[in-house]
From Swiss-Prot:
GO biological process terms, semicolon-separated: DNA transposition
InterPro entries (alphabetical): DNA/RNA_pol_sf, Endo/exonu/phosph_ase_sf, Endo/exonuclease/phosphatase, RdDP_mobile_element, RT_dom
Domain Reverse transcriptase: 481-752
UniProt source species: Drosophila melanogaster (Fruit fly)
Something else known: At least 30 copies of X-element are present in the genome and some elements are polymorphic between different strains.
Catalytic activity: DNA(n) + a 2'-deoxyribonucleoside 5'-triphosphate = DNA(n+1) + diphosphate
Keyword Iron: no
Protein name: Probable RNA-directed DNA polymerase from transposon X-element
Amino acid sequence: MMPLRILVWNADGVSTKLPEVECFVRRHEIDVLLLSETHCKGAETPKLFGFVAYTANDPSGGNAKGGAAILIKNSLAHFPLTPIATAKVQLAPAVIETALGPISFGAVYCPPRFAWTTDEFKDILEEFQTKFIVAGDWNASHWLWGAGRSNQRGIALANLVLNSEVDSLATGGPTRYPYGCRGSPGYIDFALTKGVLGIHANISAVVELSSDHLPLVITLDAGAISYPKMERLITRRTNLEVFQSQLESTLPLNTAINSGQDVDDAIELLTNNIKSAARLATRSISRQPAADRIPIPREILLLIAEKRRLRTRWMRSRHPSDKTEWNRALSRLRCALVLHKAAWFDERLANTGVESEATHSLWKATRAIKRRCTRKAPLVDSNGTWCRTDLGQAEVFAAHLAERFQPFKLASLQQVEETQDQLNQALQMDMPITPFEPCEVAEVIVRQSNNKAPGHDVICNATLKALPRQAILYITLVFNAIVRLQYFPYQWKLGIISMIHKPGKPEREPASYRPISLLPSISKVFERLIAVRIVSIMEAQGITPEHQFGFRAGHCTVEQLHRVVEQILTAYDSKEYCNSLFLDIREAFDRVWHIGLQLKIKQTLPAPYFGLLKSYLEGRRFAVRFHSAISTEHNVAAGVPQGSVLGPLLYCLYSHDMPQPDVSLYGKSMLATFADDVCVTYRSRCEHDAADGIQDFAYRFSEWARRWNIGINSSKSNNVCFTLKRRTPPPVYIEEVPVPQPNAAKYLGVLLDRRLTFSKHVTDIRTRLRAKVAKHYWLLSSRSKLSLSNKLTIYKQILAPNWKYGCQIWGLACDSHIKRIQAIQNKVARLITGCEWFVRNTTLHRDLKLATVFDEINKHSSRYHDRLERHRNRLASALNRSRPPRRLNRRQPRDLITRSPLTRVRRS
């Protein structure tokens, strides 16, 4: 096991010295960096490739000063402790898992202007565990660590070392050489340790890096534990012929599957044989160094050696001329490092593209921008206790999700008993489910994406695509047994959940993380096969309502937005109020009541599907994976399975009988749903009638939701009245709570304001688009060596979709708003070409073959309306045939097909 190597260094400002620090770390194979005097302000952290940083910055503000930081390799298992950031001391601690147990490490900086006592040093060290190494700039001198003269702080710290189990680890020589010639060398950089006496620890000073302090390297014979990497069964080193032949010889096709236990045994046999065959067919090789590391050429190594030689000479002579020579060598080295990194980066960009022949992938470069750094932060559990270890945080997440996967208790006891009684009634006999054919199974497997992560069985879609014909036949045999026995395998009911932090939410709260569930890939293949049969039954019987556009083939959000906007425009032309209610369903997919869902399945689908889906829902479990730890398993008492294929379909079935607006009472109403997004509109010339219509629907929807244990979040719902009049209808109440009445509401990603000007939506687009341009500036700027075609591809495929979404609807905005988007496109075109100010925007668009925003709106609108002509949903196809009255000079969505700047709209 490799020893752990720690760098201890007072950087005297680290931001400008990161290139040489990176070079030093690679040459000396450093695993942990303990930096002091980082000069970082606020939440600023030093960024080093392959390392994660935890800081304790000086809180006094003003000029950058002080500060400590610990940087740990991403691959090492660790967790941070609470930092100490006061004017008197800055301490950044973390715990690293090693072969000899957890060891605490801390980077410390003690400013020289404060007096210390032994008890104060003891207090800050008591925060650590039984084994720790705290190193940095203590500004304390004493003979214990080699100093000839002791100061007050050194005496206080030495008393702690002499009268406790704490030991000092120092080089015995000077570690600080002042820049001036008059100051004497100092002995103020060292480490305090505890519990590592039995471990061989060696410390040495290195004449490198550029500050008045020498870097210290601690070698600790306690190998660190790395995070386990996700196992990949099929790689480039896998011999597929060996893999397939091994599987064909181990999978028996004459297996008799007559019970649920037989199904579980068959799944276990299939999983184990696939794993063993893949491991047998994959040759193991030693891990190669990362290809994206910047190589260190011989010229830079010579400059480092020269700088080291000149610094050693100055440390001995302390002559100003030797100091000048050292500074010049340091400047040459820094310049060479910057130029070499820039040249390497330009060469890499020049060989980057979307073609298969390109050396580097353009999509990987842009994906790295989207990927957020996974910084570890401690969590607070329900008792207010801090949890820092991986296992502890995994258990906190699991406990939080276990509470979340519980049904609401909104239905009355009588309603619950009635539902249970109906569920217990005998089933009618029905035809069995049509068996699967091997060609069906093979077709579904081929269509699976290779980019999907596997479940707990680590069998990915690429592995399934490499299966031989005999394995496909065996899988078909198992699938048909599952359908025949109406038994869903036990192994497929376990989901591994990873938690993703929501931007802008507090890191210490479990509710600030979004769960992502990973299920076995083979189970998803089965779900896709059975989903095809369920969808055909639901469409034949008309179970899915026409107003539900979510999770349906051939449906999208733009069509539902079109329906809502058409109601608003019709109200404007008819001098009416269009009162709208946008409902927010609380944790819609996680709180589905299983008993109620099973009853609706029983009432709508044939009996064999009920038995199969009942087994599918019962006994489901989950565990949370957090870095290197996996929590204990918990039961799922509510909700549709996350990450599954059948989950969205089951939610649509669960909500298919929601109440409709009462058209006969108030008229001119519309209900639009997309998955769990519900919008209802009422049009009336009287604001009170419009409010009464919405209130009547809200009351009936609340009754229905309470009956089926569906929670409504009144505070997050919105009641917006779209009108050109000045009056506002009375507020709407849900469960005696008034619904907020803002001037705009976001529905399916588009901000709809009261007068439908789309000004707020255009402002939101510009904000997001400018932020994306800033993130991709290093790829798009004229100084980038990326080819012009690749820059244009980045804009078209990554940036432009931010404003193209919904342009068939928000394109109704006036020309001045559209030109605000066009202005950003003009700037991007000028950025990627580097053209001067006198080059016309029309010339840039013509030479780049880049369509204007107006042309793109026309093109997308034309395609959209052509699709509406052939749409299978009656409500969507009616959008093309309707001809509402036109009293105002406002555009309709169909007018965008031929729209151009400054065109007027004629009244019909």
